[in-house]
Each structure stands twice: as C-alpha cells, then as structure tokens.
C-alpha cells in the first residue's frame, strides 16, 4: 500500500527520527542518509511489514489508538497507580541540592570527556520500581515496557515505539513521575559518591541523568572510574546505563555530537542540538559525501523550498 504523509510522520515520531520532509523522493533519500546513525532502514521496513497486515492505514491508526487507550486505562485502574497519586511527594525529597541543572551542550565543554549515568525509559522504570503490578496487561504483570505493550498488541512497531510510551505515561500524572525519578537518581548519586567519585565532578543532574566531567584525568584513570561506576550501577534495583564519551562542537552552527566509546573499542556518534534543516548537511560532512539537491530541500508553510547556500560544517577529525 502507498504510505501517506500522516503515516510517515507517525513513523518518525514513533522512532524519534528527526525527519520533517515527507514528500518523495526526499523522504526515502533521508531515510537512507540517516541509516548509519539512526538505523532508519530496519525500522522503516518493520513499520511497512506491520502496516501491510492491515486492510488500510485507518485500521492501523485505530489499532494504535486502541492500544494506547487500553494501556492507559490499565495503568490508571491499578490500585498501585491510585496509591501513587495519593502519596505525599514531600517524602521523596532529594538530599543533594543546588547541583548543575543546565545541559552540557555549550562551547566551554567542547573536547571535554564525560561519564554519564542515565535511567533507561525513565518514566516506565520509575513507576515499575514503585510497584511492578502497575503494569499488568492481559498477559500478566510485565517486567519490561515491551512486555507490557505486547500484552495489548502483536504489532512489533508499536511495541518498540518510544512515542506511544511517552503519550501513555504522559497521561498518567507525569509531574509525580519526575519527582519520583529525581528521588531515585538522588539515591543513585548517594551510592556513587560513597564509592566512585566526589560531588565536584557532577556537571549535570536531572530526574533521569547524572553527568560527570573527567577530562582532567589520564585515560587510564578515566577508564578505571568508568569501571567502578559501571560496577555500582549494575547493583542498583532498576535499569541504568553508563556512557563514556567525548563531546564535540560542530563548527559553523550551534550543534554538537557525542563520540561514545563502546566496550568493544568502537565508537558511536550521537548528534545533539541540531534541527532537521541542518542535520542532512552535518550527515554529509560525517560521511564525507557531496551535498545533494535533496539535502537542500525542506518544507515551509505548505511548500517545498530549497536553501540557496550550503551551510559550512566543520567537524573534528574522526577516529
């Protein structure tokens, strides 16, 4: 079946893919260009495979809404959720106050090295930690978000969708989630300060992430600290992820990218603070490819438009 603009837009929202140009041939060109960094082709093929199981797109959207509504109702009708809504949230106050709360994406942190600890799927993880039976689907109490949504549908694209999780849990008193998430991360910080690092290293603290700057340490010492942090994180009662990365400022614009060092010695690139207009030009610079007419095309006030000039993009030499 031919895929509509509405369905393409939903696909990009579901997968958190920064594409806002849905006309062909530009949409497919963007999917191919972004594949190395976002895994877009696999996700698109899965979306098409699932979409083709329906008689028409409207049937798919109705299934999507049915899953969303059923999952939301299941959470809200649970006794655990109702108890959570009656909690005195002052009980979940944090002990570490006045920590830096502005993100690290600023020029003064260019070429600085960091270790981050973040809560995976924070809204789900926090509520699941509070009470596992809040996430009971027709198939029983779920251990993961995917298991929970999988209790309402067999559509793998919907099961993997980040957007539907945000919509569902965004309808379940999110301010309380954030308070509880922050309380949990405060507890994580307490345990890490006891064994891994001093509080002066913390350059960012939020409800779902802690970031440490380690640029002043030799590489060996950085890796030793990473190992200590990772070992502590594994012992926590809920799912956390550690990242070890070098932050780069992209010359010619306000964007950044994280060069993430993986355990196998490889690196991954994650772009930050880039809008959907500039991202194609940055991708071409990373891939060392020529900018195409499609890269210069964008959608503006109901019309296709094109950049007259090509932005200057300067990236550090990549390993």
Please state what every model-predicted region is.
Residues 68-71, 188-189, 229:
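Hydrophobic face of amphipathic alpha-helices
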Residues 4, 8-30, 40, 131-138, ...:
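Short, structured coil/loop segments at alpha-helix boundaries
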Residues 2-108, 167-182, 213, 317-318:
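Common nucleic-acid-contacting/processivity interface regions adjacent to the catalytic cores
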Residues 7-11, 27-30, 34-37, 44-47, ...:
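Generic structural signal of hydrophobic/aromatic residues within well-ordered alpha-helices
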Residues 171-175, 217-319:
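C-terminal polymerase-core module
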Residues 66, 77-200, 205-207:
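Helical catalytic core of nucleic-acid polymerases
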Residues 206-215:
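A generic structural motif
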């Amino acid at each position: 079946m031919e895929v509509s603009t509405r369905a393409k837009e939903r696909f990009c929202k579901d997968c958190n893919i920064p594409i806002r140009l849905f006309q062909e041939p530009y949409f497919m060109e963007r999917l191919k260009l972004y594949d190395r960094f976002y895994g877009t082709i696999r996700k698109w093929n899965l979306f098409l495979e699932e979409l083709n199981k329906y008689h028409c797109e409207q049937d798919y959207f109705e299934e999507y809404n049915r899953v969303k509504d059923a999952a939301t109702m299941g959470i809200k009708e649970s006794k655990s959720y109702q108890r959570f809504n009656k909690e005195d949230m002052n009980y979940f106050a944090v002990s570490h106050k006045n920590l830096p709360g502005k993100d690290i994406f600023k020029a003064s942190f260019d070429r600085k090295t960091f270790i981050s600890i973040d809560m995976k799927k924070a809204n789900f993880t926090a509520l699941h930690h509070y009470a596992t039976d809040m996430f009971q689907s027709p198939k029983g109490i779920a251990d993961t978000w995917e298991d929970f949504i999988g209790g309402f549908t067999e559509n793998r694209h919907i099961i993997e969708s980040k957007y539907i999780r945000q919509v569902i849990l965004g309808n379940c008193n999110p301010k309380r989630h954030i308070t509880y998430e922050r309380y949990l991360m405060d507890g994580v910080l307490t345990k890490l300060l006891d064994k891994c690092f001093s509080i002066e290293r913390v350059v960012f603290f939020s409800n779902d992430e802690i970031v440490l700057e380690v640029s002043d340490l030799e590489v060996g010492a950085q890796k030793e600290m990473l190992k200590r942090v990772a070992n502590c994180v594994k012992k926590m009662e809920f799912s956390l992820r550690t990242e070890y990365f070098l932050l780069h400022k992209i010359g010619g614009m306000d964007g950044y990218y994280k060069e993430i060092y993986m355990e196998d010695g490889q690196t991954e690139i994650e772009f930050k603070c880039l809008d959907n207009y500039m991202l194609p030009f940055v991708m071409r610079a990373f891939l060392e490819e020529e900018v195409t007419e499609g890269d210069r095309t964008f959608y503006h006030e109901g019309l296709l438009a094109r950049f007259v000039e090509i932005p200057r993009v300067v990236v550090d030499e990549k390993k």
